[in-house]
Every structure is written in structure tokens, then in C-alpha cells.
């Protein structure tokens, strides 16, 4: 059984409100989540010796999250990932979003779901956050009611996303936690062994927008169906890192997505999801300038993300899984992060 407690995390400037921190605890995990961006700020898990380490990158104070930073631990919306040139059409009408990652719109825009205060509700074994995204917010059509629920069950953190729209709008919600199973502050993730259950992936152009091709992983650097050690794999294939969508086996039921094993500590993270894709990102843009928890710095490749999602730019790609939510429908997706030791 898990328990949930709450405390003040900080005050937003100019009377913007109080940010609370919620701590979920089970016999195997401890997770801290704040109401700013539904952000996971800490996640403590034991190694095979029974020693606990915090395995997510982030900050000890609210100020860290208010500065320019790469979405550490946050919920991303209204649409995660990139929309080409920040434009799309719904039912013949064209919409224009802010270009916040030239020349595209990234992760919901200038002030996405990661940069707003959510309303919390404590549950017996978790916490539910809700907000209403007004019609026209960041250029998106229609009002969107959103609920994000975190629950803890033993070694498993479950994240459920629900949304209802007043008019047709693209919706694609994810969590942008950066993990390092050696413990946050460890210099890199090269000794992590990764498996991703995907037969195909999406090649991208130089601005990281999918070309439209769905390419087989067979015989490429993207074949992660059997475990690979990241450092050696990058060297073998002369890669700068991953920042790609892997296409999961298309079922709306819970399915296996990825497994990461850190041999030295014994920690294992398995990810399951109802989503059709996962963005595997290796922190290629981290550059060591941000000061994190306990004086940690976060250089390139010091954390990895497994962002379960619909495929990037799906709103402009008719052959990709549908991303539009219409009135009367409910967006409902769940991702499971399961921690263990091996």
C-alpha cells in the first residue's frame, strides 16, 4: 500500500500562487511530484544492496523549474513533441502556433502544460492533477479539460492522462522525466543497457520532424529489440545519441515498451504503455550548465527519457495514428514505470 503526503514547495513570483509538493511512498519507491507542471522532482529506488538513490534529474527548489530548462520531469501538452512549422489544419481551418524551437513548435508552445499551476487532489495511493486549457491557449482550438493521475503500487509508478475537448483539437500528452539508474548526478548513461520493443522507427529531417517514412529497424542503429549497452552502441554506429520516435506494436491495450538495466546497481526500469510510440531521448542537448539537486551538473547524455506518445507531427501526417480529439470523445492513455532489481 502506498501513502501520500503534501507540503509547500514554493511560491510563484508576483502572487502567481503556491506550488505544493506531494510525496508518494511505497515499500519500494518514493516519488515527489509538484503541482507546477505535474512535475516529478525526485524518484528514489533501491539498488540490489538495498541502498536508495534518486534516479531522476531535476532541482531541489522551485526556482530551478522556473528558469529555462529542458522540461525536467514535467507533463507535456497540449501536444508533445514537434509540429512542423507550427501549423496544422482541423476540418479545413488552419491554426498557427508559436515557433519555440526553430522552425517548429515544440512541446505545447511557449507556455505549455509544463509551465502552469495544476489543481491537486490527494488520493489514497496517489495524486490527481487537473486543469482547463482555455480555447485558443498557445494557438490550439477548443477548451480542453485535462486530468493527470499518478498512483504508486509497490515498485510501479502509474501515470494516467485523460482529456475532453469542446471542439476538435490535437492532443498528445507525455511525461518528460530524465532518468539515470546509477543515480542522478552520475556523469553519463553509457553503462545502461536498453531494449525497445519496436520493429520500426520514424526517420527525421534536420529539424527533427518525421519525414513520413516508417522505417524498419532491422540492420540499423535503431534495432534495440535485443539489449544494447548505450556507450558501446553509440561508438559502434558513430551516433551522437538518440532523439527518435520508436513505433510500438499498435494496440490500445497495455503493452511492453522498453526495458533499461543498470548492471552495476542492479536497477531495472520497465515501461509499459497504451500509446503507439515512444520518444527515446538521450539528453543530447544537456550541456552541463544547469545546477541540479545536491550540486549535480547535467552534461550531455547524463539522463535518458522514454516519452510515451503518439507519433510526432501526427496532425500533419495522415498515415500516422490519429491525434485529433473530438467533442464527446475521451482521451485516455496510461503509462507504467516499473522499477525492480536484477
Swiss-Prot record:
Binding site for beta-D-galactose: 81-82, 107, 176-178, 243, 279, 307
EC number: 5.1.3.3
Catalytic reaction annotation: alpha-D-galactose = beta-D-galactose; alpha-D-glucose = beta-D-glucose
One GO CC annotation: cytoplasm
Keyword vocabulary terms for this entry: Acetylation, Carbohydrate metabolism, Cytoplasm, Isomerase, Phosphoprotein
Function: Mutarotase that catalyzes the interconversion of beta-D-galactose and alpha-D-galactose during galactose metabolism. Beta-D-galactose is metabolized in the liver into glucose 1-phosphate, the primary metabolic fuel, by the action of four enzymes that constitute the Leloir pathway: GALM, GALK1 (galactokinase), GALT (galactose-1-phosphate uridylyltransferase) and GALE (UDP-galactose-4'-epimerase). Involved in the maintenance of the equilibrium between the beta- and alpha-anomers of galactose, therefore ensuring a sufficient supply of the alpha-anomer for GALK1.
Protein name: Galactose mutarotase
